């Protein structure tokens, strides 16, 4: 296959809502992005199969399979198996399996993610997937270590390219991480400390949402068992207005459409909430302001319709 840069037309499938930095990479390189709606089981696999198996310009799909950013979905076993059994029209199609939140549990009763590579090996499709993760939200963002998993063929290809980019890796940083975490048990123990900080914050926001918006019919939201985000869908056509009202009241949110390619939410309804940084007291105040703005925006829309 020719390098993607020498091919005229490239497409990537983008589960939505999804991760803005994934979409930003495609945008920088001029790769056309195609929205694939998320379901409670993961991406709409019937749509994924239709695109991948029939269009040889579809070269990849972005996936955050555990606690997806931003809706917190963990892909079901059936979804993972359907990924492994894709029959791409393009020989150079790849699944970009970004398992960024693989140990970021907020609950003891957390979902299990089937191993995609194991499923691919069963059907001989292991060249189709590139799996990766990092300690960005475990140790230090931008100063952690990263890992990649793929077939020998893909690894040989990647090593040849990386060898031209760097002479060596930051061995001292790798050593720091090994000495600090030591092993899998060390990582898990450390993540319990993260959970102790994060879960009360998630609970505070979700509790306020229930208190202020239950039964109002103006918003639905996720209650994730892990990850870093709460995804809120307000009334269609209201997300940008909610964010504008919040800003006027002193609460800054991520921009409308951030979880969609080209920052264009076709229904203008999704808002990503990241409750990790503020104190619980600040979160409770901000969540109340947010719910009030949801009510105001919904009221404006309903009045305008009449």
Model-derived features: positions:
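Conserved core of the PLP fold type I
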Residues: 1-91, 102-124, 239, 296-298, ...
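Hydrophobic "anchor" residues on beta-strands that sit immediately upstream
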Residues: 60, 94, 130
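Walker B catalytic acidic pair
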Residues: 98-99
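Conserved core segment of the aminotransferase class I/II
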Residues: 118-199
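PLP-dependent enzyme catalytic core of the Aspartate aminotransferase-like
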Residues: 125, 248, 262-306
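Conserved glycine-rich beta-strand-loop-beta hairpin in the small C-terminal domain of fold type I
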Residues: 192-206, 218-233, 247
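Helix N-cap motif at beta-to-alpha junctions
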Residues: 235-239, 278-280
